[in-house]
């Protein structure tokens, strides 16, 4: 058949293997590793899902080659323990049986290795080593790595590569970027040595990387592909530039089979290496394109890639030979398969909310805001089919209701979804005009398409009442009635100057030049960014001590940076008391009044669950399930998870 994206779907030979297309699953750590650093069946299932989804290669992440000095967290796979062989072998097999190449990342944390985590290696707590002695901002003392230890680590990379080849992996991935050990040696900001590994020349700073690659090549033999990740730029004072990276790449090129160009260092803002929703798609591709002009080895790019049209252009124009994706393949593990089949309208696009990365930090688990399967890949295989099809009525067309309807219909039930308004989307309707939320609003259209494909009957402008339920006589009633915006009990909320935060997407709502937002929660802060990007003068007023407190640990610092960058004025511990024709009157902790002039006051102080509507329907059907904001106002993550499992439980 004629492919819609012929370049993206074309094979590529690297070393003695062939990628079946140009879309590769980049390293993503799965936390379900044993305390001894062994791969579990749950972890193998995590990687297998991407192989089933059509990725050309799937990279198992963060295998540490030197346990005493290299661990940066507690969930590394320990390649110095042959006990990991069985788990690695099963992981490789689970990837390869679906036609993907099994790849594995070899890493060492260098000065950012966690000494407390490495204590389990036995003996006294080891010292942290880097290229040069220094004191980190947190007070940690770093010692210069002695040459004997350098030789030991170089040898460990080779031994680790030999072990994973024995386990059946098709290729290896050397992590030489993002501020880890190899990067530290190449960086003039951290390498101040005066020996042959020292800072005086690019060749000396690259020596460790080249010796590691040579050690791996000696261990795995000719033809076995070596992929090497480097950062195209560091983005830190005194760090290396793209010109230095090009020289580094020219030294590496003849020794490797695929050069993976990322960006950033450990010291950067998290958003540099992991692009946020505020970044352009493909924001790092220019670095790969610049390096590719100077090397003969195939080059892979990465960085907020999930649009097939853009990825096709990258390959067709010669900017890169391979596109790699991480979070995009959490949101939709079947993205490559959908591209191959020309079904790109069905792709669920990553919203770059950082939930996956924040949850790993917070609870050491893996979830995805918009894909309830993530973290449950293994157990999801054993979902029992329903004993008999049931008649299901879903009341509410927000995300929780839609995914409940899709899931139930895909399991064979007869499903009708009724939405009171003229449009699906629920709480997500308010984000459709926000440029950095377009992928989140796209989820509404995707769920609608999934419902139609699954045979869900969709009725708009249809309220679910007791009488309607009696007429329909469903076996199961799913209540997804949503929430309503809270309107504070202050004078002026009915003024033409006042706009509810949920109303920003309405075409008839005009927003003036000077805007005051009452409410500094996540929605209020994101509204402030949106309006400031449109050139509005924005002041954000919050009665509590901090703003955006419900944002996750990865998202919040970046959101605060955006507010500062856009010159949004933030006033905390400030309470709005009345809206006037001129703006918003507030009081501080001492009761002193402050006035903020505004053409428009956006009221964004939260949502209230529609509990009264729920109570009237609790006994309307034999089985009644509640999901989404009508239970309590919640993030899209919780709404989708509850809705998905409600559909699964029927």
How does the language model describe each region?
Residues 332, 337-338, 527-541, 639-650:
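Internal hydrophobic alpha-helix adjacent to the cofactor/substrate pocket in enzyme cavities
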Residues 188, 422-442, 548-559:
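Conserved N-terminal glycine-rich FAD pyrophosphate-binding loop of Rossmann-like flavoproteins
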Residues 397-410, 512-536:
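Rossmann-like NAD(P)H-binding beta-loop-alpha module
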Residues 527, 546-556, 627-650:
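A conserved FAD-binding loop/helix module that cradles the flavin
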Residues 305, 398-400, 423, 485, ...:
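Residue-level detector of alpha-helix initiation sites
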Residues 1-395, 399, 403-415, 511:
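Flavin-dependent oxidoreductase catalytic cores
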Residues 441-487, 493-513, 533-616:
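A Rossmann-like FAD-binding core segment of flavoenzymes
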Residues 413-427, 536-547:
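Glycine-rich FAD pyrophosphate-binding loop
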């Amino acid at each position: 058949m004629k492919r819609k994206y012929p370049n993206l779907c074309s094979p590529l030979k690297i070393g003695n293997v062939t990628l079946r297309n140009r879309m590769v699953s980049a390293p993503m750590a799965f936390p379900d590793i044993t305390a001894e650093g062994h791969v579990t069946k749950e972890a193998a299932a995590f990687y297998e899902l991407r192989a089933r989804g059509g990725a050309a290669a799937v990279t198992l992440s963060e295998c540490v080659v030197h346990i005493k000095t290299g661990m940066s967290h507690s969930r590394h796979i320990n390649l110095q323990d042959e006990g990991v062989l069985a788990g690695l072998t099963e992981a490789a097999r689970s990837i390869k049986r679906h036609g993907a190449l099994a790849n594995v990342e070899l890493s060492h944390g260098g000065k950012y290795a966690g000494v407390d985590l490495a204590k389990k290696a036995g003996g006294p707590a080891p010292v942290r080593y880097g290229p040069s002695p220094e004191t980190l901002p947190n007070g940690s003392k770093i010692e210069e790595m002695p040459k004997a230890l350098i030789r030991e680590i170089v040898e460990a990379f080779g031994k680790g590569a030999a072990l994973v080849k024995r386990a059946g992996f098709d290729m290896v991935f050397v992590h030489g970027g993002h501020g880890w050990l190899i990067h530290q040696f190449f960086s003039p900001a951290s390498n101040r040595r005066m020996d042959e590994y020292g800072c005086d020349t690019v060749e000396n700073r690259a020596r460790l990387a080249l010796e590691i690659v040579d050690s791996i090549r000696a261990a795995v033999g000719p033809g076995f592909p070596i992929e090497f990740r480097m950062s195209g730029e560091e983005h830190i004072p005194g760090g290396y530039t793209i010109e230095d990276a090009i020289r580094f790449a020219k030294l590496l090129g003849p020794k490797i089979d695929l050069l993976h160009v990322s960006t950033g260092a450990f010291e950067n803002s998290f958003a540099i290496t992991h692009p946020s929703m505020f970044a352009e798609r493909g924001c790092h591709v220019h670095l790969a394109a610049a390096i590719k002009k100077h090397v003969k080895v195939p080059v892979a790019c990465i960085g907020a890639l999930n649009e097939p049209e853009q990825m096709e252009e990258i390959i067709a124009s010669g900017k890169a030979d391979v596109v790699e994706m991480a979070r995009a393949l959490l949101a939709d593990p079947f993205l490559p398969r959908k591209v191959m089949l020309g079904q790109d309208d069905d792709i669920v696009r990553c919203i770059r909310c950082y939930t996956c990365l924040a949850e790993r930090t917070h609870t050491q688990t893996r979830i995805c805001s918009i894909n309830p399967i993530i973290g449950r890949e293994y157990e999801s295989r054993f979902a029992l089919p329903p004993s008999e099809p049931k008649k299901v009525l879903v009341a509410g067309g927000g995300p929780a209701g839609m995914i409940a309807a899709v899931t139930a219909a895909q399991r064979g039930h007869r499903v009708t979804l009724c939405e009171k308004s003229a449009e699906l989307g629920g709480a997500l309707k308010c984000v459709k005009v926000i440029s950095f939320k377009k992928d989140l609003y796209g989820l509404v259209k995707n769920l609608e398409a999934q419902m139609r494909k699954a045979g869900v009957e969709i009725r708009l402008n249809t309220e679910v009442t007791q009488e309607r339920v009696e007429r329909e006589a469903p076996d199961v009633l799913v209540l997804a009635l949503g929430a309503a915006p809270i309107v504070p009990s202050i004078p002026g909320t009915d003024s033409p100057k006042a706009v509810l935060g949920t109303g920003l997407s309405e075409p008839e709502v005009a927003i003036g030049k000077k805007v005051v937002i009452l409410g500094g929660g996540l929605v209020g802060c994101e509204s402030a960014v949106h309006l400031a990007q449109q050139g509005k003068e924005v002041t954000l007023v919050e009665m509590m001590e901090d703003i955006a407190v419900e944002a996750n640990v990865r998202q919040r610092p970046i959101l605060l940076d955006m507010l500062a960058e856009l010159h949004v004025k933030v006033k905390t511990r400030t309470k709005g008391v009345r809206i006037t024709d001129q703006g918003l009157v507030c009081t501080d902790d001492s009761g002193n009044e402050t006035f903020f002039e505004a053409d428009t006051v956006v009221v964004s102080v939260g949502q209230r669950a529609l509990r009264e509507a729920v109570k009237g329907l609790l006994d309307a059907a034999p089985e009644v399930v509640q999901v989404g904001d009508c239970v309590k106002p919640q993030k899209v993550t919780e709404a989708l998870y509850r809705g998905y499992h409600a559909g699964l439980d029927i």
